């Protein structure tokens, strides 16, 4: 009754205008959601052969475990020779042998380089440059990364941990890309995949340094994508929520938490498709559970608002409390 009275005093032209605006907004959301579903479930990604014939090389950093290991295995399965880069030489040798044995019939070659990205040594990067300069590198997977051992307030973050996160996640990724990308540009083909994180997309209290490092990679990768547009080199930052890896410390999969094999398979199948990352250029959220979560947050609560930030804080406070209790129990057993 009251609403009818109010509306009766509003000029018809105003009501028509408001209805038009509302219809436009709703139509935009519907179109966005249809695009999301098509990107996730219908449309295929770019054929990886675009970046080189069989025998072209792929460089994978952080290759000894988790997502990096899975990228190396699946790219080898697709016919790419693999340069494996990580800290532990024994793990790299084991993985190289596994790949060569598993794909012996395909004559897949591997090369390894053991380097500690936290050390940021010029001689390590010189070795990398010498290793890849003579190779036809078609794909670079910037996977190396480090997070906090447990969620921690920024002012309590150990200086060494803070330094390592920035050095590994940011400096390491930039230096590797600066070595590998020029050859791609010269050959006029290539793909640079950089592993991002919801931690860089959503402000994440108690993971402030890690969150900041991943936000930096988002801006850097998108900027690089703009620079290399038209050169034949595609740049894509891959956003993910949780995956069952050593870094996440999660062991059980769920609808929203895939294992590395599933996540990498989806990522490689959806290269060039934005998935849930519709509002960020040169970015993809390929796994459907993560993409739906991203779309919902962006179109309802928003990303950087106080409610979302505080909920994120509460979640990580809980994780920290459980981790500290576990450490206390373990200390008593020792």
Curated annotation (Swiss-Prot):
Membrane topology value: Single-pass membrane protein
Superkingdom of source: Eukaryota
Residues the record lists as binding NADP(+): 59, 116, 124, 143, 210, 214, 243, 245
Compartment annotation: Endoplasmic reticulum membrane
GO CC annotations, alphabetized: endoplasmic reticulum; endoplasmic reticulum membrane
Pfam families given in the database record: adh_short
Biochemical pathway: Lipid metabolism; fatty acid biosynthesis
An annotated GO BP: fatty acid elongation
Reaction catalysed by this enzyme: a very-long-chain (3R)-3-hydroxyacyl-CoA + NADP(+) = a very-long-chain 3-oxoacyl-CoA + NADPH + H(+)
Cited CDD domains: 17beta-HSD1_like_SDR_c
Name of the featured protein: Very-long-chain 3-oxoacyl-CoA reductase
């Amino acid at each position: 009754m009251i609403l009818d009275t109010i509306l009766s005093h509003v000029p018809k032209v105003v009501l028509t205008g408001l209805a038009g605006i509302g219809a436009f907004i709703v139509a935009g959301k519907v179109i966005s959601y249809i695009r999301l579903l098509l990107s996730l479930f219908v449309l295929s990604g770019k054929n990886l052969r675009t970046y080189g014939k069989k025998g072209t090389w792929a460089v994978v950093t952080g290759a000894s475990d988790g997502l990096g290991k899975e990228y190396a295995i699946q790219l080898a399965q697709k016919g790419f020779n693999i340069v494996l880069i990580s800290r532990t030489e024994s793990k790299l040798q084991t993985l190289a042998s596994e790949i060569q044995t598993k794909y012996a019939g395909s004559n897949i070659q591997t090369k390894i380089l053991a380097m500690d990205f936290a050390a940021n040594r010029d001689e390590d990067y010189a070795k990398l440059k010498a290793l890849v300069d003579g190779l036809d590198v078609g794909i670079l997977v910037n996977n190396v990364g480090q997070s906090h051992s447990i969620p921690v307030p920024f002012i309590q973050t150990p200086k060494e941990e803070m330094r390592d996160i920035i050095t590994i996640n940011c400096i390491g990724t930039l230096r590797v890309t600066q070595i590998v990308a020029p050859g791609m540009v010269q050959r006029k083909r290539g793909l640079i995949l950089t592993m991002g994180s919801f931690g860089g997309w959503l402000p994440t209290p108690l993971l402030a340094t890690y969150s900041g490092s991943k936000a930096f990679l988002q801006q850097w990768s998108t900027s690089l994508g703009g620079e290399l547009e038209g050169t034949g080199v595609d740049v894509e930052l891959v956003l993910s929520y949780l995956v069952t890896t050593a870094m996440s410390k999660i062991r059980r999969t769920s609808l929203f938490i895939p294992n590395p094999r599933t996540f990498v398979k989806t990522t490689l199948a959806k290269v060039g498709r934005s998935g849930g990352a519709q509002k960020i250029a040169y970015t993809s959220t390929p796994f459907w559970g993560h993409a739906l979560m991203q779309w919902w947050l962006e179109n309802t609560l928003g990303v950087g608002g106080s409610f979302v930030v505080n909920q994120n804080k509460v979640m990580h406070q809980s994780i920290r409390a459980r981790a500290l209790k576990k450490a206390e129990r373990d200390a008593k057993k020792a």
